[in-house]
């Protein structure tokens, strides 16, 4: 097995889905290796980018796979790739030990549909990523995520804070 330091980062997208009230969609993770405690189980949708796939197309695909949502408009993008390392204690189990963390392109996305469009229990053709969901004020997000992802969430909130307004 490769040394932790030599492992690459998994290329991913993250989506901050903002409703008309300026609140952000968060889902309660369905367990997994990232489960630290019952306080830090909430996160925004995120997922891998397929080889050759455009990041915006990947964001729309992943959002649909995790939430069933298609009624969206892209409103902003973090210009940089944001990176986090997973703890060494779980690195061998996460993604079959192939990655040391993720390199993510983040998008702010306006949700233009109705809440009834959201379906996390039976997403189209995929296993559920979340067990429940809610709309949350943007500034609360860093306190709800697992600690090793917190710096990424702090940066995303800083980049998109002006978007947390009702429209």
Swiss-Prot record:
GO-annotated biological processes: nucleoside phosphate metabolic process; ribose phosphate metabolic process
EC main group: hydrolase
Location of the motif Nudix box: 47-68
Alphabetized UniProt keyword annotations: Hydrolase
Boundaries of every Nudix hydrolase domain copy: 8-158
SUPFAM superfamilies listed in its UniProt record: Nudix
Keyword Iron: no
InterPro entries, A to Z: NUDIX_hydrolase-like_dom_sf, NUDIX_hydrolase_CS, NUDIX_hydrolase_dom, RppH
Taxonomy, superkingdom: Bacteria
Function of the molecule: Accelerates the degradation of transcripts by removing pyrophosphate from the 5'-end of triphosphorylated RNA, leading to a more labile monophosphorylated state that can stimulate subsequent ribonuclease cleavage.
Record-linked PANTHER family: NUDIX HYDROLASE 26, CHLOROPLASTIC, UDP/ADP-SUGAR PYROPHOSPHATASE
Family: Belongs to the Nudix hydrolase family. RppH subfamily.
The protein, known as: RNA pyrophosphohydrolase
Organism, scientific name: Rhodopseudomonas palustris (strain HaA2)
């Amino acid at each position: 097995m490769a040394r932790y330091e030599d492992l690459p980062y998994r290329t991913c997208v993250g989506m901050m889905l903002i409703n008309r009230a300026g609140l952000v969609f968060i889902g309660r993770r369905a367990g997994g290796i990232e489960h630290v405690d019952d306080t830090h189980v909430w996160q925004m949708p995120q997922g891998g980018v397929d080889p050759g796939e455009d990041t915006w197309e990947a964001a729309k695909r992943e959002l649909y796979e995790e939430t069933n949502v298609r009624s969206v408009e892209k409103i902003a993008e973090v210009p940089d790739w944001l990176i986090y390392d997973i703890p060494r204690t779980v690195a061998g189990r996460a993604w079959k030990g192939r990655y040391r963390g993720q390199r993510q392109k983040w998008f702010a996305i306006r949700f233009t549909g109705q809440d009834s469009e959201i379906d996390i229990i039976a997403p189209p053709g995929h296993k559920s990523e979340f067990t429940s969901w809610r709309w949350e004020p943007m500034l609360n997000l860093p306190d709800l995520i697992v600690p090793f992802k917190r710096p990424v969430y702090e940066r995303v909130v800083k980049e998109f804070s002006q978007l947390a307004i009702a429209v």
